[in-house]
């Protein structure tokens, strides 16, 4: 992993200052849907309303505003409470997570501004400096410069980015264009939620933490570019609502259903063991409850794997609905990048938003 060269200041356990961890502190999907139900029908304001290609009504990863026939702005924001104890790693993870929404839409980040909340007393500002440097390091890796930001006094530390990117409006990847026959490819392993929960409790092995941090700080840039070149038009990134929750949103928007083969889903090292030991976040429990009635999990799927399918992820991979003819070559390209990409299922005709999870692919 890349390192931040600035001298580190002794820090308390940052995860002890947070009631949640990473994207597990998101408002639960059920509450978010309730909130936005009251906003449906509100008109987009201003003369550019007709050029708003993706907005709140679509529930996608980012907003998209067309500038002209060849350029569209992609705007997103994401921030969260500490997910790890190392300040620079937290900054790097939060930045990669925020940038991911631009990649999920098929865009490239241009610039960002910091969003930070920090206690006015009791936590050294030098620690926030390490967080910001970590975020700037990953943004620079993405070719995205950080142009200032905003801070507030808050007893619970929070950090993230508001990101502006650029995309071709004719080549956007959105959640509403998956079609039956598309092959579902996941580009990163899942399990960051159980690792973060165990870390917060001081029970995560160091090698497991290291693997999770490496995954969470890995940009989705290469995966996004490969997907665009393969002709993918339906995608999302897997974060706080878990794999099944984000798939459900894609399916509901696309008026389709899906099959998932649990044995094909890549898991982070140690994730199954931690799930089996009961390190399950409140966000994951909320995800599981929200998917009741939408996710039919075969009883033969191991209980810990079923948990991980709902596990609240932070800076997860892209979930791509790839055209059948393009899927094999796309999978090869992703694996050549060193990604643990896997074909985990397919889109099928069926009840909108529903997912059937089977133990393994039947030949």
What are these regions (language model features)?
Residues 162-172, 207-227, 301:
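Active-site glycine-rich loop that binds ribose-phosphate moieties when present
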Residues 1-20, 31-35, 46, 50, ...:
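Glycine-/charge-enriched secondary-structure boundary and capping motifs
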Residues 2-104, 144, 179-185, 189, ...:
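N-terminal glycine-rich phosphate/pyrophosphate-binding loops that anchor nucleotide-derived ligands
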Residues 23, 64, 98, 106, ...:
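Buried hydrophobic positions in well-ordered alpha/beta secondary-structure cores of metabolic enzymes
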Residues 63-74, 217-223, 288-299:
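Acidic-glycine-rich active-site phosphate/pyrophosphate-binding loop
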Residues 87-113, 130-141, 219-234, 238, ...:
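Small-aliphatic-rich amphipathic alpha-helix that forms the alpha element of a beta-alpha
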Residues 68-84, 89-92, 108-205, 346, ...:
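Glycine-rich anion-binding loops of enzyme active sites
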Residues 52-54, 62-65, 100-103, 136, ...:
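A generic local secondary-structure boundary/capping motif
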């Amino acid at each position: 992993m890349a390192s931040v060269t600035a001298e580190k200041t002794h820090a308390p356990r940052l995860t002890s200052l947070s009631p949640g961890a990473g994207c597990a502190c998101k408002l639960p999907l059920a509450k978010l849907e309730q909130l936005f139900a009251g906003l449906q029908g509100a008109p987009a304001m201003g003369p550019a309303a007709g050029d708003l290609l993706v907005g709140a009504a679509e529930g996608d990863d980012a907003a998209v505003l067309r500038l002209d026939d060849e350029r569209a702005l992609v705007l997103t924001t994401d921030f969260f409470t500490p997910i790890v104890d190392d300040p620079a790693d937290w900054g790097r993870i939060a930045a990669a997570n925020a940038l991911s929404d631009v990649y999920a839409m098929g865009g490239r980040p241009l610039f960002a501004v910091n969003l930070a909340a920090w206690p006015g007393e009791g936590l050294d500002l030098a620690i926030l400096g390490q967080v910001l440097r970590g975020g700037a390091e990953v943004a620079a890796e993405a070719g995205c410069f950080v142009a200032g930001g905003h801070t507030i006094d808050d007893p619970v530390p929070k950090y993230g980015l508001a990101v502006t990117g650029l995309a071709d409006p004719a080549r956007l990847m959105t959640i509403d264009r998956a079609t039956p026959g598309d092959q579902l490819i996941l580009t990163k392993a899942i399990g960051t939620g159980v690792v973060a929960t165990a870390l917060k409790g001081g029970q995560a092995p160091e090698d497991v933490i290291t693997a999770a941090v490496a995954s969470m700080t890995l940009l989705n840039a290469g995966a996004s570019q490969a997907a665009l070149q393969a002709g993918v038009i339906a995608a999302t990134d897997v974060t706080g609502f878990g794999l099944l929750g984000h798939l459900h949103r894609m399916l509901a928007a696309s008026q389709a259903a899906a099959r998932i083969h649990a044995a094909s889903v890549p898991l982070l090292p140690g994730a199954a063991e931690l799930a089996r030991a009961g390190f399950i976040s409140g966000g994951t429990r909320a995800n599981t409850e929200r998917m009741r009635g939408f996710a039919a999990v075969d009883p033969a799927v191991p209980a810990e794997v079923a948990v991980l399918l709902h596990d609240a992820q932070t800076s997860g991979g892209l979930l791509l609905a790839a055209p059948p003819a393009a899927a094999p070559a796309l999978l090869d390209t992703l694996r050549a990048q060193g990604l643990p990409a896997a074909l985990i299922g397919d889109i099928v005709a069926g009840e909108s938003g529903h997912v059937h999870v089977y133990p393994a692919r039947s030949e």
